[in-house]
Each structure stands twice: as structure tokens, then as C-alpha cells.
């Protein structure tokens, strides 16, 4: 008896990721899976789709992403990613986990169930990212274990605390071993590590890295046996500087990720489809670029049921009108064409922004003529450690002519009263201030401005909103975006969030000296992350990654660099 199947797609050029070639063949689909990729089969298809003149590639996979960086809830993010051909993501929910602990992770899992997008949760390994950061929760191995009972959980996310790994911290190693005990794996985070340090990470069981910024770094990690995720986010623009590390011989060790990408950039550029476009623009063959975007991400995360268009695989696929420009006609997820969705984010009420910061807390006396200053690196999350001449003063506020501004970090989770104050170069403000509750990874309040009063006004606005981002011109609020979900995510639609981000950027142009080549809001959010080089500010003060210790703002040393 002839078997009836749900669908056959004919006429297209179909990518075989195993041979890295396009084939003129058919795809037979039934019950959410591909049952054959042969042109002729003795099946009767209930639906026939003619894709003549088009290309079909596997659904794309984002191998490492923090959903919270989009600033929309998972159910909203899924709507956008599926439009861009992304059918699976491996996400590290450590942003909301740092704010709300297990409740934050569970919220993301629950809300993600509203989208057809497959969201594979890698449990956060470093909450807090370092013991001396003031976040909202602490998660030990024992806290994470019950989450492995949920099918969405697929391993351990990036282990960022190299020091804990190197000294054999019991809880850190338990988190890693738990991931393997449940049949999964553990992601690494090897920013700035040398070959010897990479071996320490590998011996602990960490088998991926997404922090490469150069060809040499990527090659070192491949030689060490790690899978490398080439990253293109809002700030982390690393695909073009690293794509030269990929060869036909080692290509299976590379996949693509976005890490941190705002919804506005996802809408204008794309997600992994943008990484593919960049790779091909740099000279990579389309067959290879689309393989990095699909099969390789699946292999890195041990997702054996996806990543190719072969029998037995999930029917996750992308139909393209234009191969080299990645022009997507439509996306299929588990055998169903993606259609517009009307779902709305689930409510979240687990946290409140709480602090009692006042103007006096922003005082920064400088008794000497030199200061340690954070230097912004445009479109990178690393910073420069600048040593700049500063006039002695009882309270430094801003030197707009030299683009040296005051920056503050206010603990917002437990109302401890901790406030870190430092200096930053690179934001080009001429007046006003900006503030936000997105501040990796502890997500305290972070602000930068030209006066203490402007900083306090911006802080007051986001406190009133129970989290968000604000731009003020002295006392006037020019734009604000409430982030009701833990101070990280908006409860609004992705379209509304994109509009609000555009308003924030327009407001920033009003108070800035010149147009910036980078996003000031997400850039500011990374100036508080102590596990990324070089100089960062936390609620406890200025932190030097090179010495892995806190340092004063005012110094006596010889001048290192001037502006």
C-alpha cells in the first residue's frame, strides 16, 4: 500500500551539509520530520510545494545567545528570529538569573514555550559571575540540578570564572560534571586566555568558546579541541576579524552565534542570517557558510535531530529566494510553515528596583593629577585602561572637552547602599546623562553623565519605571524605555520596543557632541562586567582585569596614555 505523507517540496536546490553541495532533489515531510531527501519516492503527498528557482537550507542555529540582550521576552524574540530563518537557539539565561535567580530562569522557560522556536537552555554557571559582584541571586550546583528535569534544558552555559576553574572550586566543577552526568555538555568562556590557560579549561570539561576577536585566538581554541562560535552581536562585531581562521580542513569546528544583540539590530540586520551574509561577503562559499549556521551548531550542542536536511531529522528549513544575499521566502519549523503570531509575554512580578542613592553618593574627590579611566572600544566589550591627567578637585563631574565623564554603578537588588564611581572616555556627551538597569552581569543601575544632577535625574526615572533605560537633558527626560521584566526585558511587542530604542538613540544625539559609531546603551551595559578585560566599574569600585583586583581612580603612577 502506498504511504501518504503530509508534504513534498520539489524543484529547489537543497543543501547537503555533509557533502557541502546543493542538490536538485525533493524533501518529503511527515509528522514534523524529513522522511526522505530523494527526488523519487513511492509516496503520495497531501500537499505539494513547488520551490522551483529557490534554495533550501537547514534551519539556522544560534549557538550562544543571551535572549535578554534583545530586550524583549522570549515569545516576542521568537517571532523575529523565525522570520530570519533561525529555528533553534542555545541560550544562557544568566542575565535574568542574576536578577531573580531560579524564578528568572523559570520565567524564561515558561514564556519561551509560547513560541515554535526551539529554545535550548544552557543553565547559567556563573551567578554571580565573580564572588565580589553584587547581583540579585547566587546559584549553586544544587540549585540548578532540578532544572535538568525540564526538556528545554540542554547543558551548562559559559563558565566565566577562570579563577574558580583553575583553583578547582568544588561548586564550579560540580556544575560542569552535572551537565555531563545528565548527558549534555558545558560551554566555555575563554576571553583573553593563553594556550596554557585553555588547557585548564579543557581539562575541566569546557568544550566551546565564543569570545574570539582575532584569527590567532580562534586557531588556538581549535587546536585545543574547542568548538568556536564566531560572534556578531550589537557590540561584539567579531565575524569579519575571525572568519579567516576557518579552512576546509577545520570548518567543522566553527559555528555562528550572536551572544548579545538588541531587537533593533535583529530587525535591521538579522540574526545568524547576518553572520552568513558577512561570511559570504568575506569570500566563504555559500555551502560552507550555511553549514556553519546549521549542522555545526547542532553538533557542538549534541542536537542530533537537527542541522541537516536528511531522513529522520526535524523538518526545520529555510526557503531562500536569493542564496548569497540570504533573502528568505519562508521558514518551516517541525514541518509547519511559520505564520504571524499574536502571543503576548507572560507577566513577571518577581523583582523591584530598590536603592537609596543620593547626590552625595556620586562624589569623586581626586587629590592627585592622574586618574585611571575606562576607555571605550567602539563595537567591542573590552575596554582600554587609560591613565589620564586630571586636575585635582574635591568632586570631579565632567571634562566634556576631553570627553571624560563620570560613571556610577548603584546596587539595586538588596538596597545595600553600595555605589561605585569612576571615569569613562568615549561617550562624547556635551550635556545630560543616560542610565539603565541593564549592566552585565549583576545588572545594577549604571549611569554616565556630564553632571551629578543629570545622573541622579536619569537614575530616578528608571527607578520610577522599576527598571529601564533613560536619556535626560539635565532635568528634562528626553526618552525612556521601561523594562518591566526584571529591569532587563520589556513587556511590550518587539515593534514597540524597536520604536522606543529608536527614540532613545535620537535623544542621545541631542545630548551628544557627535554621532557615535557604536550603540551607547549596550556599550554602557558592558562597562560593568569584570570578567572581560580590561577596566570595569562595579558597585564596589573600579576593577582591573589585568590584576583581577580593585584599584583606586586617583593614582600616582607615571602617565600611561593621554587624550
From Swiss-Prot:
* Annotated disulfide bonds: none
- Cofactor(s) in the UniProt record: Mn(2+)
- This protein's UniProt keywords: Hydrolase, Manganese
A GO molecular function annotation here is: adenine deaminase activity
Q: Which domain of life is it from?
A: Bacteria
Name the InterPro entries for this protein: Adenine_deam, Adenine_deam_C, Amidohydro-rel, Metal-dep_hydrolase_composite, Metal_Hydrolase
The broad enzyme category this protein falls into is: hydrolase
Keyword Manganese in record:
yes
What EC number is given for this enzyme? 3.5.4.2
Its BP terms in the Gene Ontology are: adenine catabolic process
Catalytically driven reaction(s): adenine + H2O + H(+) = hypoxanthine + NH4(+)
State the family named in the UniProt similarity comment for this chain. Belongs to the metallo-dependent hydrolases superfamily. Adenine deaminase family.
Q: What is this protein called?
A: Adenine deaminase
Q: Which organism is it from?
A: Lactiplantibacillus plantarum (strain ATCC BAA-793 / NCIMB 8826 / WCFS1) (Lactobacillus plantarum)
Lineage here is: Bacteria, Bacillati, Bacillota, Bacilli, Lactobacillales
Amino acid at each position: 500500500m502506498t504511504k501518504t505523507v503530509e508534504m513534498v517540496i520539489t524543484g529547489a536546490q537543497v543543501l547537503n551539509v555533509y557533502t557541502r553541495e546543493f542538490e536538485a532533489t525533493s524533501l518529503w515531510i511527515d509528522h514534523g520530520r524529513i522522511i526522505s531527501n530523494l527526488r523519487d519516492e513511492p509516496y503520495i503527498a497531501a500537499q505539494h510545494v513547488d520551490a522551483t528557482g529557490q534554495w533550501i537550507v537547514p534551519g539556522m542555529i544560534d549557538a550562544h545567545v543571551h535572549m535578554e540582550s534583545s530586550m524583549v521576552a522570549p515569545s516576542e524574540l521568537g517571532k523575529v528570529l523565525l522570520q530570519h530563518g533561525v529555528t533553534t537557539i542555545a541560550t544562557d539565561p544568566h542575565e535574568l538569573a542574576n536578577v531573580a535567580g531560579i524564578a528568572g530562569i523559570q520565567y524564561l522557560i515558561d514564556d519561551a514555550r509560547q513560541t515554535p522556536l526551539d529554545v535550548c537552555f544552557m543553565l547559567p554557571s556563573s551567578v554571580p559571575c565573580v564572588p565580589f559582584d553584587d547581583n540579585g541571586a547566587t546559584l549553586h550546583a544544587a540549585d540548578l540540578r532540578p532544572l535538568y528535569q525540564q526538556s528545554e534544558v540542554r547543558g551548562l552555559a559559559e563558565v566565566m570564572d577562570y579563577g574558580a576553574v583553575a583553583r578547582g572550586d568544588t561548586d564550579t566543577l560540580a556544575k560542569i560534571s552535572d551537565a555531563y552526568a545528565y548527558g549534555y555538555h558545558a560551554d566555555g568562556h575563554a576571553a583573553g586566555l593563553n594556550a596554557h590557560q585553555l588547557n585548564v579549561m579543557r581539562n575541566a570539561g569546557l568544550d566551546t568558546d565564543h569570545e574570539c576577536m582575532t584569527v590567532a585566538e580562534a586557531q588556538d581554541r581549535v587546536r585545543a579541541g574547542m568548538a568556536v562560535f564566531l560572534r556578531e552581536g550589537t557590540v561584539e562585531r567579531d565575524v569579519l576579524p575571525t572568519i579567516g581562521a576557518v579552512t576546509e580542513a577545520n570548518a567543522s569546528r566553527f559555528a555562528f552565534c550572536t551572544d548579545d544583540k538588541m531587537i533593533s539590530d535583529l530587525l535591521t540586520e538579522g540574526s545568524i542570517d547576518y553572520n552568513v551574509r558577512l561570511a559570504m561577503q568575506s569570500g566563504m562559499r555559500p555551502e560552507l557558510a550555511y553549514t556553519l549556521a546549521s549542522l555545526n551548531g547542532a553538533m557542538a550542542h549534541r542536537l542530533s535531530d537537527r542541522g541537516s536536511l536528511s531522513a529522520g531529522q526535524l523538518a526545520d528549513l529555510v526557503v531562500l529566494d536569493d542564496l548569497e544575499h540570504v533573502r528568505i521566502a519562508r521558514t518551516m519549523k517541525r514541518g509547519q510553515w511559520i505564520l504571524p503570531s499574536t502571543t503576548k509575554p507572560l507577566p513577571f512580578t518577581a523583582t523591584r528596583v530598590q536603592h537609596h542613592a543620593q547626590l552625595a553618593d556620586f562624589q569623586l574627590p581626586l587629590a592627585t593629577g592622574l586618574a585611571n579611566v575606562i576607555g571605550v572600544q567602539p563595537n567591542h566589550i573590552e575596554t582600554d585602561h587609560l591613565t589620564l591627567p586630571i586636575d585635582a578637585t574635591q568632586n570631579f563631574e565632567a571634562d566634556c572637552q576631553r570627553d571624560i565623564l563620570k560613571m556610577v554603578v548603584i546596587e539595586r537588588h538588596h538596597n545595600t547602599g553600595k555605589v561605585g564611581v569612576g571615569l569613562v572616555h568615549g561617550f562624547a556627551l556635551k550635556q545630560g546623562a543616560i542610565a539603565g538597569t541593564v549592566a552585565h552581569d549583576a545588572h545594577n543601575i549604571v549611569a554616565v553623565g556630564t553632571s551629578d544632577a543629570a545622573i541622579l535625574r536619569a537614575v530616578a526615572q528608571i527607578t520610577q519605571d522599576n527598571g529601564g533605560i533613560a536619556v535626560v537633558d539635565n532635568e528634562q527626560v528626553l526618552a525612556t524605555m521601561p523594562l518591566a521584566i526584571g529591569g532587563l526585558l520589556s513587556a511590550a511587542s518587539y515593534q514597540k520596543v524597536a520604536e522606543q530604542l529608536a527614540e532613545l538613540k535620537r535623544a542621545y544625539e541631542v545630548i551628544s557632541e557627535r554621532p557615535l559609531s557604536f550603540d551607547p546603551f549596550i556599550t554602557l551595559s558592558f562597562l560593568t562586567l569584570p570578567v572581560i578585560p580590561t577596566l570595569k566599574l562595579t558597585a564596589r569600585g573600579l576593577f582591573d582585569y589585568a590584576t583581577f583586583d580593585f584599584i583606586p581612580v586617583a593614582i600616582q603612577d607615571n602617565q600611561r596614555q593621554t587624550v
